[in-house]
Amino acid sequence: MVGLSNGEIPLVQIFVRDNNVDQALKALKKKMQREGSFREMKRHVHYEKPSEKRARQKAEAVRRARKLARKRAQREGLLPMPKKPGR
């Protein structure tokens, strides 16, 4: 996101090879997901008050901290490792 100012969404470029539009759409969706474009667009649908923004950011930070603590506890053997699906 170099050179972007005032919250602009970066342009994503995808090449269509051999008229394979389905594969190009899949690649576009994956790229936008990785860059966080969907989340950003969803966030800009409605105005978010500064107090709501702070509350959201704080909740996200708490969620990240809990996840990190849970992973750390699992690594140290304090919690059982999560079960893998399909096994």
Curated annotation (Swiss-Prot):
One of its GO terms (cellular component) is ribonucleoprotein complex. It comes from the Bacteria. Residues 47-87 are annotated as: Disordered. Keywords: Ribonucleoprotein, Ribosomal protein. The keyword DNA damage does not apply. One of its GO terms (molecular function) is structural constituent of ribosome. Gene3D superfamilies: Ribosomal protein S8. InterPro entries: Ribosomal_bS21 (IPR001911), Ribosomal_bS21_CS (IPR018278), Ribosomal_bS21_sf (IPR038380). Residues 47-63 have a biased composition (Basic and acidic residues). Pfam families: Ribosomal_S21. Residues 64-73 have a biased composition (Basic residues). GO terms for biological process: translation. Belongs to the bacterial ribosomal protein bS21 family. HAMAP family: Ribosomal_bS21 (MF_00358). This is Small ribosomal subunit protein bS21. The gene is rpsU.
